[in-house]
Amino acid sequence: MKITVGCGHLKTDDLDQILSFVSPNLAILDSRSVCGIEHLHQAATLSLSSHNNGFNLSKDKSTEVLLYLTFQRQISKALSLSGVNKTTKNVGWVSFGKASIDLSEIITEDDSVISIHNYDFSKLAKDVDISLDNDLKQKIIMTRTAVLPVQPR
């Protein structure tokens, strides 16, 4: 199954309209919960792998992406940390399979919105020393993402 990721600025602040695009195969998330495009690719790949191999925590691949991005086992916590809300201005997205909708209706693509510089360490990784080198901080976050399946329940 093909995985496509992207990011950009929201064109609307109509939360209902934005959420109407979300489906089991399309995740739209707050870009501040993504520590670089590699992190988004990693979460998408792990989500697909978990569903293909029967160790998924969520019934939908799109929700599973949020769990991996935030290294959470509880959907409600993952949604509060990375879900789109009234204050979200920039988003990342993951599509599994052929995209059947046109996100350009609600998103202006801009690759710069997802970066380690925009990652919300204060909300998602308070214990990471922000004075560390950016590559090291990203490795820490991506390691936490990778070990989610082996964490005790």
Residue ranges and their predicted role:
Residues 30, 60-74, 105-113, 141, ...:
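Residue-level signal for functionally critical sites in structured catalytic/ligand-binding pockets
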Residues 17, 42, 72-74, 138, ...:
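Residue-identity detector for glutamine
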Residues 83-153:
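Glycine-rich, aromatic-bearing surface loops/beta-hairpins
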Residues 2-4, 25, 88-92:
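Short, surface-exposed beta-edge/turn micro-motifs
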Residues 4-61:
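N-terminal interaction modules that seed assembly of large macromolecular complexes
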Residues 15-18, 78, 103:
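Hydrophobic side chains in well-ordered alpha-helices
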Residues 18-23, 82, 106-107:
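Hydrophobic, Leu/Ile/Phe/Ala-enriched alpha-helical segments that form helix-helix packing faces
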Residues 37-99:
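Ordered, amphipathic secondary-structure segments that act as subunit-interaction surfaces
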